[in-house]
């Protein structure tokens, strides 16, 4: 017959807090999982946060720069196509371009001045976003860390203002087109006009990102002097873990020691009797 090998299994039961009055409570606990940032120093965490803010600020600057270049590139082109109903003649015009035909609008301002208001809001939008980009580029070149807290808020506000002005510009241009082509012509907006809407969306998106970057930069900095109390969880993940302070645990221990001393003394006293 083959001899069966006897295997000995040992289980590790670490010391855990005990419930008062229950000596059989032996639920093993293990430390909770640590976050990767818990082992980092406060200086390293702050350095990573500053680097992330710089990357986000660069993204906002790139969006605004791309939108501005696209806006400037579309401005000298035609935005609308006119079709004369009587003879089928096609005419083209834009915000800054005018056709020489008598049916097109002229350079002379006429009420309700939709075209002039549209041009004014276009210029305000361009100059506003140029101001924000100038602040961003100056912060990158000079590397001024003192103004970074309010820089994101300023860029966000300028992006929203520029997007609002561009929105008014596009709506006023459409109003000018509808007013000019009442009965004699039909109008059709070209792809160059719709690309300006993409620039407006990018301005809004950059403003939202910059605002979120400003809100996250206002979070309190890490303090190395703050003591962190480690947490414990059940190994099985079921039920709460009771924590008993050493001061409270001394009472049950002293009672248990006194009971054990009495039990030892009782047999001795019986011998004397």
Curated annotation (Swiss-Prot):
Membrane-topology annotation of the record: Multi-pass membrane protein
Location in the cell: Membrane
GO cellular component: plasma membrane
Keywords, ordered alphabetically: Membrane, Transmembrane, Transmembrane helix
Record InterPro entries: PMP-22/EMP/MP20-like (IPR050579)
Positions of region (Disordered): 242-273
Chain intervals with Basic and acidic residues compositional bias: 247-266
Spans traversing the lipid bilayer: 53-75, 121-141, 155-175, 189-209
Main location: membrane
Protein's recorded name: Transmembrane protein 202
Organism per entry: Homo sapiens (Human)
Gene: TMEM202
């Amino acid at each position: 017959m083959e001899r069966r090998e006897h295997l000995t299994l040992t289980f590790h039961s670490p010391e855990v807090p005990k419930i008062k009055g229950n000596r059989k409570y032996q639920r093993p606990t293990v430390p909770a999982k640590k976050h990767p940032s818990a082992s980092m120093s406060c200086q390293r965490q702050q350095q990573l946060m500053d680097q992330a803010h710089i990357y986000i600020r660069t993204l906002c600057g790139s969006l605004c720069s791309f939108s501005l270049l696209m806006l400037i590139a579309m401005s000298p082109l035609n935005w609308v196509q006119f079709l004369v109903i009587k003879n089928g003649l096609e005419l083209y015009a834009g915000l800054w371009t005018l056709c020489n035909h008598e049916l097109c609008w002229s350079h002379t301002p006429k009420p309700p001045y939709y075209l002039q208001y549209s041009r004014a809001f276009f210029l305000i939008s361009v100059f506003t976003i140029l101001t924000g980009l100038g602040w961003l580029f100056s912060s990158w070149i000079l590397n001024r860390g003192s103004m970074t807290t309010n820089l994101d808020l300023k860029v966000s506000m300028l992006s929203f203002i520029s997007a609002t002005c561009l929105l008014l510009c596009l709506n006023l241009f459409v109003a000018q087109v509808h007013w000019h082509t009442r009965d004699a012509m039909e109008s059709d907006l070209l792809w160059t006009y719709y690309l300006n809407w993409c620039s407006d969306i990018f301005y809004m998106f950059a403003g939202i990102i910059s605002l979120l970057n400003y809100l996250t930069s206002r979070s309190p900095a890490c303090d190395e002097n703050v003591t962190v109390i480690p947490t414990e969880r059940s190994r099985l993940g079921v039920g709460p873990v009771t924590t008993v302070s050493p001061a409270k645990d001394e009472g049950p221990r002293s009672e248990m020691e006194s009971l054990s001393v009495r039990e030892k003394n009782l047999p001795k006293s019986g011998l004397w009797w």
